[in-house]
Amino acid sequence: MARYKDAVCRLCRREGTKLFLKGPKCFTDKCAIEKRNFAPGQHGKDRKAKIVGYGLQLREKQKTKRMYFAQENQFRNYFEKAAKGQGVTGEMLLQQLERRLDNVVYRLGFASARRQARQLVRHGHIAVNGKKVNIPSYQVSVKDEIAVREGSKEMTLLGQIKELTSHTTVPGWLIVDRDNWKGSVSSLPRRDEIQMPVNEQLIVELYSK
């Protein structure tokens, strides 16, 4: 998938569900899908046909990719690795997506949305085990320590993020120290700890054809 540069709210409308790409705004009546719950484009309102079979599987894959800002080749690699591993393929796929550094930064409450977390990582504001990592897709491991770098802690943006994420619930597989902008990975995420509106079995069926 090429990097998406258009308004991300159009992606939610395209998928017909909230992808939670803009943080707190997604939980308000300002969310685009609350105002225009139909596909973007001139004929968006007319696209009401029920999607079944392959189309349903494809849409589930696209939706999941977009939620995590994963590119097509990355997503396929995640699936192939999950399929070769020991465990339930769909759950292991989601586990790899959750272990992306940009997602972990978001889950820890260091960003109000995955898109913002991705930018923080790319701009060099995040360290893993004391070393700067600027690759959003970097896979964290158990016992890894993730932190906002010392030189970045004075950013005005972090004060805004702290206020916006003050009620964020951190999943059980992560430990966070909000005051010092650091956290760690205590375990690999279980399926019941991944609160995402995803039917991973549809994705498994798609790639297994």
From Swiss-Prot:
A GO term from the CC aspect: small ribosomal subunit
InterPro entries associated with the record: Ribosomal_uS4 (IPR022801), Ribosomal_uS4_bac-type (IPR005709), Ribosomal_uS4_N (IPR001912), S4_RNA-bd (IPR002942), S4_RNA-bd_sf (IPR036986)
The keyword Protease is assigned to this record: no
GO biological process: ribosomal small subunit biogenesis; translation
Assigned keywords, A-Z: Ribonucleoprotein, Ribosomal protein, RNA-binding, rRNA-binding
Source organism, top-level taxon: Bacteria
Subunit structure: Part of the 30S ribosomal subunit. Contacts protein S5. The interaction surface between S4 and S5 is involved in control of translational fidelity.
Entry's family note: Belongs to the universal ribosomal protein uS4 family.
Stated name of the protein: Small ribosomal subunit protein uS4
Organism: Koribacter versatilis (strain Ellin345)
Gene expressing this chain: rpsD
